[in-house]
Amino acid sequence: NVEIGTPSTTVTWTVPTAIDASAVTTVSSHNPGQSFITGTTTTVVYTATDEFGNIGQCAFTITVTATDSIDPVVTVSSGFITQQVEIGLGGVNVFYTEPTATDNSGTAVLFSRSAQPGDFFPVGQTVVTYIFQDPSGNFGTGTFTVNVVEVDTTPPVVTVPNGIITRQVEIGTSGIIVFFSEPTATDNSGTAILDSRTHQPGDVFPVGQTIVTYTFRDPAGNPATGTFTINVVEVDTTPPVITVPTPSIITRQVEVGTPGVSVFYQEPTATDNSGTAILVSRTNQPGDVFPVGQTVVTYTFQDPSGNPASATVTINVVEVDTTPPVISVPSTFITRTVELGTPGVNVFYPEPTASDNSGTAILVTRTNQPGDFFSVGQTVVTYTFQDPTGNPATATVTINIVEEDTTPPTVNCINDVIRTVELGTTSAQVFYSEPTASDVGQATLISRTAQPGDSFPVGATVVTYIFGDNAGNIADPCVFTITVNTVDTTPPTVNCVSDVVRVVELGTTSLAVVYTEPTATDISGTASLV
């Protein structure tokens, strides 16, 4: 017997002996120490021959058998698995990587296990055993320990008597001593100890909000925090301070006979030691209509503590002549045309006039006058009139000098285009460089009867391009011809015949043979035998 997987082995044995009255010669098919293949049976034959040719034989078999005596090898990923549970739960479902096994036979099957992943394991240590078996019945065992430990991960529960405690102090006071009920804590362990606190009852707290933090811990070291706010508020008894913009008397003029006017002004503002002063009332506001004479406007402010303060602004409306002259412009836009390239022209036009409620309106300035030379483009002419009170009025006249374009575009036409296609083709897609045009202004393609990439039929097609400019001038048409010619480049198609075989009498040297001649077709309709 040999271990499974051993391909062969050497075998020894006691050599048979032969006894005879005369000398004996012995030969054998195999010899001790030879290698024999596993899984085979071999017959060994010994033959003994004496001097007279008498023969005696001895035969036996050698059988080499493979056997498996090696246990499977078990691999345990972790020999000790620890899982924590909260105190009082008793145990926990544990998932783990199961052991595996290998065997020299190539197969190791799980035979039994004392637990499996996902089972409930109690607090303490549990030994888990896995047994594997190979096809020969050899067993391999692997064990590991699941250790379930009770731990305390629950923090204490903190109780805060008040989330916010408010105390008042006189404005300008920096702070105050505050007494309060301290937070308490409970824990599932039965003990929660105060670990730290940022403040304690009787401390001085400054004006504003102070967050007080209490931290408790249980015997397992789990922390828990409770916070509350000490709010120290300043009390304000000082009214706001009002600032009235200078001047406090605001004067506006209105035209004589006008009952009043809408007046816009800068409003009073207020500051307060609290930082906030709110406008609570005003008898008027910017943009209101104020009558001729003096109107006292009262503004009242209040701080967050309700302290009021008032101030006044006087609006003084005075009648005056503020109406400017009324200008009449015969024509606000005057257009003259000049030939293209002419720099400008002298223009005569009717001048604006003016009237005023005082009866007098005098022309004081004008930037141009009739008969002046005006350049191509637009020139704004400004006229200014004034009444005896000095009220001015202005009007404008625009002189527009326009160049006229009467020259049509210059067209760069192209030569006729010739393309060839295969005989039988009815049309062809033709690409070509398009005609162009230039102009003193802007040349535009108005129309075209075809364009590059169009399909053109066999024969001649006349193509026309027409260009114009932005002045409406039309150039002579650009006319060229696109010719599509057909050519035949495809050879005829020959319908050949099969080889011809005829039989003649032995000794005959020739024979007249009749056969069907080959034929041919062509896309032109004619194929000639040459």
UniProtKB/Swiss-Prot annotation:
Modification after translation is described as:
Glycosylated.
Query: What keyword terms does UniProt attach to this protein?
Result: Cell adhesion, Extracellular matrix, Glycoprotein, Repeat, Secreted
Compartments annotated for it: namely:
Secreted, Extracellular space, Extracellular matrix
Q: Which GO terms describe its cellular component?
A: extracellular region
Disulfide pairs?
none
HYR domain span: 1-66, 67-150, 151-234, 235-319, 320-403, 404-486, 487-530
- Primary localisation category: secreted
BP GO annotations: cell adhesion
Q: Establish whether keyword Glycoprotein is in the entry.
A: yes
This protein's source sits in the domain of life called Eukaryota
Under the subunit heading, UniProt states: Homooligomer in presence of calcium.
Purpose of the protein: Major constituent of the hyaline layer. The hyaline layer of echinoderm embryos is an extraembryonic matrix that functions as a substrate for cell adhesion through early development.
What name appears for this protein in its UniProt entry?
Hyalin
Q: Which organism is it from?
A: Lytechinus variegatus (Green sea urchin)
